[in-house]
Amino acid sequence: MKAITLLFLVGFIGEFQVFSSASSPINCQWGSYAPWSECNGCTKTQTRRRSIAVYGQYGGHSCVGSAFETQPCQPTRGCPTEDGCGERFRCFSGQCISKSLVCNGDSDCEEDGADEDRCEDAESRPACDKDKPPPNIELTGRGYNALTGQFRNQVLNTKSFGGQCRKVYSGDGRDFYRLSGNILSYTFQVKINNDFNNEFYNSTWAYVKETSTEHSSSSKGRFLFFSSSSSSHGYSSNTNILTKKKSYQLLVLQNTVEVAQFINNNPEFLQLAESFWKELSYLPSLYDYSAYRRLIDQYGTHYLQSGSLGGEYKVIFHMDSEKVKKFDFHSEDKRKCASSHFQFLFTSSKQKCTTMEEVLKSVSENEGNLLRGVPFVRGGHSGFLAGLSYLDLNNPAGNKRRYSQWAGSVPDLPEVIKQKLTPLYELVKEVPCASVKKLYLKRAIEEYLDEFDPCHCRPCHNGGMATVQGSQCQCYCKPKTSGVACEQGVLLGDQAGGVDGGWNCWSSWGPCVQGKKTRSRQCNNPSPSAGGKSCIGETSETRQCEDEELEHLRLLEPHCFPLSLVPTKFCSSPPALKDGFVQDEGATFPVGKNIMYTCKEGYSLVGDPVARCGEDLQWLVGNMHCQKIACVLPALMDGIQSHPHKPFYTIGEKVTISCSGGRSLEGPSTFLCSSSLKWSPEVKDVQCVQREAPLTPKVPKCQPWEKLQNSRCVCKMPYECGSSLGVCARDERSKRILPLTVCKMHVLQCQGRNYTVAGRESCTLPASAEKACGVCPLWEKCDAEGSECVCRAASECEEAGFSVCVEVNGREQTMTECEAGVLRCRGLSISVTGIRPCVAEAA
């Protein structure tokens, strides 16, 4: 059984505020459209695509509209699906299948059944006594987008048996099913886990970092993306549930139900779905990211190598960190909770995790004892999903019944879970120019993954993690921080300190030199400062050029490189643009290729951004330059810090300069970005000097009704009083008599209010209520069993409190609050006649 790890915020020492001001919202901005693709000979259309120039962040708007545009055109080449199949059989759709599948009694042409249309002798056909495939077998043939965690359109033909008669026994169903030719192994084995896996995360940052998947593009540049379960019933990943107004801890409960397990065949033996095969046929044999990206949008980045059919249940409960902090969790409480596996939520038991139940009730922010969470459910009947979004802390049996109803519906409506994936480009086959298209699809998937690299995002404050989701950058905050940019709150403990560095995006690939090319990146998003950690990884990367592989394919498949369309000459790398760079540069620059320039942050491009590789192998570049639109700080000496630390500052923004290490700043500390895009005052000759240690000021000794603030004693507030003896007090201004405490009277008199002690019979003091151990007043202590507060003896007073004048049996005497409280606790009738010692009042 999986042990529970409770990640609670305890034992932190020190706090450090890294950022304090919110970042302005950044709206998403589209870039310019790329050139139109080659005209598709099958659909007689061409497409073009625009990429995102600026990702939305810090609460800014998403990009509106489609990234693609399509228009009709006149093709210069025919449709590949109209070509012949050689020695193979051609379906009406144009797809080619083995002749051994013709007239075998099965419709192996997925859409039209052409392979069985002209079979005269039906009795001589091979026969299988079972034609019924396993339930929901079509789920095993879908594509999968590894970035979004969503299943896409069908890529495998799960209806074809491949001319084989392989059967599998269902077990509980007492029936036999015939396996698809694409299935290597299929097992009916129901697995229901009665123990719920559960984890605590001390922040949304910790949850996303734990559940994110680390991906590598071909460039070996690693980055994280958030991949969550998606459901056909609408419970999909929605980051808006991770509210930005507070810091939250997360409790995650999850479980799975398995119905069957499957393994698909090796790629070379898989039969493709006709719709997917057609799209592969339509792909151009010249690299055009727009065309290949459209295929990725429709069919995903991977297909299923193996997995299980079943259901997946996960619910996330958000707990206000400030409320959780009020509860003291002992090691014994944690041990009980860990051993219970949270079964107390689903099964009635005498041994309950009491402390945990109290925490859940306190932080639920919901009515009664209903703990509402955010469910992520895959599989099962949609009618049961609403009941999975909450838990009734007083009705474990009801919780179990609702979960069991959903789990019981999973065998009838399963989804794929626990999937293992293979890249989609491994399925590029049985189409013209398959080797070339396979290479280009691999390149397009790498380019697609790079679009979602967090390097496109601006830094989150306080060490938050940025992820790309659609056209937005989302910040996930560390413990005790919150806000759209994680700008609110403080970092705690060993996380307090400087700003850790983050990688910027890779540069474009350099030219091929001896069959290799190189690119680089910088650790400046943000740059490490104030002792923060530097980036982990390499600053440069080298890999083999694709040119040699393309030249080899040109020899094997020369028809895929028509001379009229494929240039044999290439331009060198495009000229550099000061304060700018080439957008989506690519690896090679054939004659006729257009590229687009853009400017780095803080600059705007003026002029024509498009350049073209000419016939003379020279770049045709128009007049353009990057115009400064913001202020940039000059390089500062070591030990000088800027706040806020940003790559550039817009007009009207201020930056504050400070020194670290106990040194003092010479010169102005605040600078304004003026309308002339210069700093006012000018940032020059700023330096830090060692300052003499200041004399430690004498700390004044405050009265009990005072507190130390800014090196001087000031009056406390009444609510800051702790346990104190109750008295009746007269407000000499309004003549009202009201119940107060000795401490509160001292505080009010300190603030200039005139209160005097009145007789005890003049007001009703609050009745002494039974209190649990831990909150006993001065004159009480915990009993031997440690369950409730009982009266102390006068000699047992540990904290005396104020000295007051008390009348006992008609005689006034000076006592401490604790001594007087002991007498009152033991039933003696006493009356407080003054809030100071009797002798002092007499004087």
From Swiss-Prot:
SMART domains from the UniProt entry: CCP (SM00032), FIMAC (SM00057), LDLa (SM00192), MACPF (SM00457), TSP1 (SM00209)
Keyword Disulfide bond listed: yes
The Sushi domain, residue ranges: 569-628, 629-690
Limits of the LDL-receptor class A domain: 84-120
Domain EGF-like: 457-487
Record keyword Ligase present: no
Principal subcellular localisation of the protein: secreted
Glycosylated sites: 36, 202, 503, 506, 509, 696, 754
InterPro entries, A to Z: C7_FIM2_N, C7_KAZAL, FacI_MAC, Kazal_3, LDL_receptor-like_sf, LDLR_class-A_CS, LDrepeatLR_classA_rpt, MAC_perforin
GO cellular component: extracellular space; membrane attack complex
Domain of life where this protein originates: Eukaryota
Keywords noted in UniProt: Complement alternate pathway, Complement pathway, Cytolysis, Disulfide bond, EGF-like domain, Glycoprotein, Immunity, Innate immunity, Membrane, Membrane attack complex, Repeat, Secreted, Signal, Sushi, Target cell membrane, Target membrane
Entry PTM: C-, N- and O-glycosylated. O-glycosylated with core 1 or possibly core 8 glycans.
Positions of the UniProt region annotated as CCP 1: 545-615
Annotated segments matching region Disordered: 114-135, 517-537
Covalent S-S links between cysteines: 28-63, 39-73, 42-79, 85-96, 91-109, 103-119, 128-165, 337-353, 433-560, 455-505, 457-473, 460-475, 477-486, 512-545, 523-535, 571-613, 599-626, 631-673, 659-688, 702-713, 715-750, 721-743, 728-763, 773-782, 776-789, 791-825, 797-818, 805-838
Amino acid composition bias (Basic and acidic residues), ranges on this chain: 121-133
Regulation (activators, inhibitors): Membrane attack complex (MAC) assembly is inhibited by CD59, thereby protecting self-cells from damage during complement activation. MAC assembly is also inhibited by clusterin (CLU) chaperones that inhibit polymerization of C9.
Subunit-level organization: Monomer or dimer; as a C5b-7 complex it can also form multimeric rosettes. Component of the membrane attack complex (MAC), composed of complement C5b, C6, C7, C8A, C8B, C8G and multiple copies of the pore-forming subunit C9.
Protein name: Complement component C7
